């Protein structure tokens, strides 16, 4: 029984563990194969990038220029191909080697696994034909360009240990000049180019100076307009007003930050304050300023009412009717500005409450 139990436990535990290990090993082997394939693809990509044999050579940009007569004929092509096998000068070895390499590149790609598009093969073929045709027509230009290419090759070989130069490093944009002759690919006269550059810099400096002076004048004009249009501190009336608004006494001190309006606040009358008997007597209602005689009579009446108790009855000036004595201003902090003889809320409330009481 003991052996049977141990066998059953071992099978129940060992079989799933073994299956898991086998599956993990299979996945690991598959991942390693995928990584190896990716490494091979990366190596081929690097070789394709840094191998200039499969791309257009940008050392001689004249080779990309199309001839005015169009593509060369087949007879000229055959003659050029035949003449390319003969080395007339030792300086043309590099170009001959490049031409033969470009001619045989399309044939070699059939055996290689790397795919080359049709347009790339056509460009390489056309490039080799143009190089050979240009060499056969003008040996002097060919020698000059070969010297330049040799110097660039020597320079690349000298720096090859530090950094490997790719064909994409040679892709320098060339901008067309509108002033040059259309027949020549580049301006041949150095003096003309220097004169053009100097004229360009001079015009740039003149335009910069003009623009800066223009912006300075515009900024000064805008500053003057803003200063003239701004209203510095003229928020309060220049002469006292007779209108009574519902503002507290501290509303005049809300603009203490305005330095220009401080002088006006000290001298100006607080027109928003609670009307008192003295102010009312000094400033009667505007309706009674119809004539000078009425104003004189009002002043005389107010002078007489200050001494007697019948000042409010004899005076015809308009006064606010409050819930308290208007003379007792020291004990009362606030009042209702809209409470007058027609809207006496406290009196109306008192009358309403008295009306609710039972009559005896």
Swiss-Prot record:
Domain of life of the native organism = Eukaryota
Which residue ranges does the entry give as Cytoplasmic-facing topology? Answer: 30-360
Give the UniProt record's GO annotations in the biological process aspect: cell wall organization
Bias-annotated ranges (Acidic residues) = 86-96
Membrane-side (Extracellular) residue stretches: 1-8
Q: Which residues cross the membrane?
A: 9-29
Recite the UniProt keywords alphabetically: Cell membrane, Cell wall biogenesis/degradation, Membrane, Signal-anchor, Transmembrane, Transmembrane helix
Q: Where is the composition biased (Basic and acidic residues)?
A: 189-198
Composition skew (Polar residues), residue ranges: 101-110, 292-316
Topology of the protein relative to the lipid bilayer: Single-pass type III membrane protein
GO CC, alphabetical: cellular bud membrane
Compartments annotated for it: namely: Cell membrane; Bud membrane
According to the record, the residues making up region (Disordered) are: 63-114, 176-204, 284-316
- Say which family it is in: Belongs to the SKG1 family.
Q: What does this protein's UniProt record list under function?
A: Plays a role in cell wall integrity. Affects the cell wall polymer composition in the growing region of the cell.
Q: Please give the name of this protein.
A: Suppressor of lethality of KEX2 GAS1 double null mutant protein 1
List the source organism. Candida glabrata (strain ATCC 2001 / BCRC 20586 / JCM 3761 / NBRC 0622 / NRRL Y-65 / CBS 138)
Q: Identify the taxonomic lineage of the organism of origin.
A: Eukaryota, Fungi, Dikarya, Ascomycota, Saccharomycotina
Q: Gene behind this chain?
A: SKG1
């Amino acid at each position: 029984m003991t052996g049977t139990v141990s066998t059953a436990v071992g099978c129940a535990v060992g079989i799933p563990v073994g299956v898991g290990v086998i599956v993990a090993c299979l996945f690991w082997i598959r991942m390693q194969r995928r990584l190896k394939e990716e490494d091979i693809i990366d190596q081929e990509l690097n070789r394709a990038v840094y191998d200039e044999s499969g791309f257009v050579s940008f050392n001689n940009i004249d080779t990309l220029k199309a001839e005015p007569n169009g593509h060369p004929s087949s007879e000229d092509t055959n003659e050029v191909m035949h003449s390319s096998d003969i080395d007339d000068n030792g300086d043309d070895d590099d170009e001959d080697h490049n031409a033969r390499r470009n001619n045989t590149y399309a044939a070699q790609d059939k055996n290689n696994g790397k795919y080359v598009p049709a347009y790339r093969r056509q460009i390489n073929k056309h490039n080799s034909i143009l190089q050979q045709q240009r060499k056969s027509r003008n040996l002097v230009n060919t020698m000059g360009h070969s010297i330049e290419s040799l110097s660039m090759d020597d320079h690349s070989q000298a720096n090859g240990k530090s950094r490997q130069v790719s064909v994409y490093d040679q892709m320098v944009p060339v901008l067309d000049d509108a002033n040059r002759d259309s027949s020549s690919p580049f301006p041949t006269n150095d003096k003309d180019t220097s004169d053009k550059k100097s004229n360009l810099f001079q015009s740039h400096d003149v335009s910069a100076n003009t623009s800066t002076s223009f912006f300075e004048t515009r900024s000064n004009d805008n500053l003057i307009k803003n200063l003239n249009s701004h209203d510095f501190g003229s928020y309060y009336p220049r002469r006292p007003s007779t209108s009574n608004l519902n503002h507290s006494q501290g509303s005049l001190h809300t603009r203490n930050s305005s330095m220009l309006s401080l002088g006006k606040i000290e001298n100006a009358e607080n027109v928003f304050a609670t009307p008192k008997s003295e102010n009312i007597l000094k400033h009667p209602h505007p309706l009674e300023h119809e004539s000078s005689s009425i104003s004189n009579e009002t002043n005389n009446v107010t002078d007489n009412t200050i001494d007697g108790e019948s000042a409010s009855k004899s005076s015809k000036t308009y006064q606010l009717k409050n819930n308290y004595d208007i003379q007792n201003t020291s004990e009362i902090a606030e009042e209702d500005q809209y409470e007058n003889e027609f809207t006496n809320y406290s009196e109306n409330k008192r009358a309403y409450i008295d009306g609710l009481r039972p009559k005896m």
